């Protein structure tokens, strides 16, 4: 049987893989592993439960809360909140753990369940495995006064907003900001906190109806935000995804500013302020080489991790670093948050525009993105990608040709029978030539002929 937990909790089609029964069982299992097994003061364990606004979140949250309370866990029902807000509240309320119901940037029919440990930290693999192992066991069934109670937590969003405002190095008076909330969990708090910070705010994608989350808007569909920024003459635009754990931006001319560029701006700002721990940024192997070049010239070192914000978080925790993230817009400020926070990132980015008096376009020019091409080579034996001699020779030849002007990355998919071939070079013509050549070698050496998908 395959592992139930994926890279970001349990995720799937609501009422397909992710049923109310499974949600309740996961909650009962978590009640033991994260609650009773770790609580020694004789009090009932406490958990924060939050969700994004997709329709299935209503019945799944009800199932989770039933599973927790019937297992002797007191529940703070925080309602609709961004994922990072749920993590913050676990720490702020000194709860034993938290549960977030969201499928992030996925479409409305999907949903997911992820857990946070005490302090709002993501769970390591071994704790997720313990929860999964507990699924096959009889749940705890207290009676009478020992059952858990459910408390509606009406000021959850306000607590989060106050926290965010306290992180700003400068208020945002004089800035006009367009926010695209993806019809998601930040539809209420993101516009409010930007207004409270002093910005003039234009809002799109903030009318969630349970079915329109991520539908043509948000960080995976930047077209509407680009149009709105130019139309309204805004200084910048900020886009979230459905659960607001990521942020992409748009400058005043409608140009995209991705996660790498955002990290470059913020790393340089923190270093200048003397606040970048050990002058190190943590980023994944998928970050553009231009980020490393720009920061190297400024005396900042990049610690590279595997793909996924959980690996960025692990490296940050292990090294005590305070800034990290991904090209996709997951940016983690460990001084203020335990996970990627799109609202926090947008605020910090806008604050740099206000603080420096420079446009976002000018700030983002600190990094020159190298042309990048990725080809997914399908239907191959991905397990041999790292050991095949012919593939290794082709990669070595490509790296020799590129020298310090580019790089090559071969990455087997974690879920499909394919290998991703990524090449960065000084120009797109070179990147395309080398990438297609490597992809052909991978296909020839590791699989049967078929089309290459770019």
Curated annotation (Swiss-Prot):
Catalyzes the conversion of glucosamine-6-phosphate to glucosamine-1-phosphate. Its EC number is 5.4.2.10. This is Phosphoglucosamine mutase. Its cofactor is Mg(2+). One of its GO terms (biological process) is peptidoglycan biosynthetic process. One of its GO terms (cellular component) is cytosol. It comes from the Bacteria. GO terms for molecular function: magnesium ion binding; phosphoglucosamine mutase activity; phosphomannomutase activity. Mg(2+) binds at residues 104, 241, 243, 245. Keywords: Isomerase, Magnesium, Metal-binding, Phosphoprotein. The keyword Phosphoprotein applies. The active site is at 104 (phosphoserine intermediate). NCBIfam families: glmM (TIGR01455).
């Amino acid at each position: 049987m395959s592992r139930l937990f994926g890279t970001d909790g349990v995720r799937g089609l609501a009422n397909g893989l992710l049923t109310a029964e499974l949600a309740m069982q996961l909650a009962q299992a978590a009640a033991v592993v994260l609650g009773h097994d770790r609580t020694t003061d004789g009090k009932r364990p406490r958990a924060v439960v939050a969700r994004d606004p997709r329709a299935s979140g209503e019945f799944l949250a009800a199932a989770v809360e039933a599973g927790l309370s019937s297992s002797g866990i007191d529940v703070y029902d925080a309602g609709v909140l961004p994922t990072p807000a749920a993590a913050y509240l676990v720490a702020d309320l000194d709860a034993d753990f938290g549960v977030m119901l969201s499928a992030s940037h996925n479409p409305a029919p999907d949903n997911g369940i992820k857990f946070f440990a005490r302090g709002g930290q993501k769970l390591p693999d071994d704790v997720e495995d313990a929860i999964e192992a507990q699924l096959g066991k009889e749940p705890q069934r207290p009676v009478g006064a020992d059952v858990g109670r459910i408390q509606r937590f009406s000021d959850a969003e306000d607590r989060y907003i106050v926290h965010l405002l306290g992180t700003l190095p400068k208020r945002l008076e004089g800035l006009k900001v367009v926010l695209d909330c993806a019809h998601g969990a930040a539809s209420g708090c993101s516009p409010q906190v930007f207004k409270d910070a002093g910005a003039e705010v234009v809002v799109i994608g903030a009318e969630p109806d349970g079915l329109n989350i991520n539908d043509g808007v948000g960080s995976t569909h930047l077209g509407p935000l680009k149009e709105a920024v130019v139309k309204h003459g805004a200084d910048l635009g900020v886009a979230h995804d459905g659960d607001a754990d990521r942020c992409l931006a748009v400058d005043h001319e409608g140009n995209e500013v991705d996660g790498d560029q955002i990290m470059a701006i913020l790393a340089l700002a923190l270093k200048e302020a003397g606040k970048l721990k050990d002058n190190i940024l943590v980023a994944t192997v998928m970050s553009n080489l231009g980020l490393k070049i720009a920061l190297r010239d400024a005396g900042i070192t990049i610690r590279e991790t595997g793909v996924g914000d959980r690996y960025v978080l692990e490296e940050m925790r292990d090294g005590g670093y305070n800034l990290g993230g991904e090209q996709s817009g997951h940016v983690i400020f460990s001084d203020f948050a335990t996970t990627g926070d799109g609202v926090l990132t947008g605020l910090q980015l806008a604050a740099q525009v206000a603080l420096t008096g420079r446009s976002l376009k000018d700030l983002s020019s600190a990094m020159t993105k190298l042309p990048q091409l990725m080809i997914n080579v399908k239907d191959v034996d991905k397990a041999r990608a790292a050991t095949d001699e012919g593939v290794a020779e082709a990669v070595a030849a490509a790296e020799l040709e590129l020298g310090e002007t580019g790089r090559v990355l071969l990455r087997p998919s974690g879920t499909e029978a394919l290998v991703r071939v990524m090449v960065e070079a000084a120009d797109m013509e070179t990147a395309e030539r080398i990438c297609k050549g490597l992809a052909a070698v991978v296909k020839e050496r590791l699989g049967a002929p078929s089309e290459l998908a770019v």
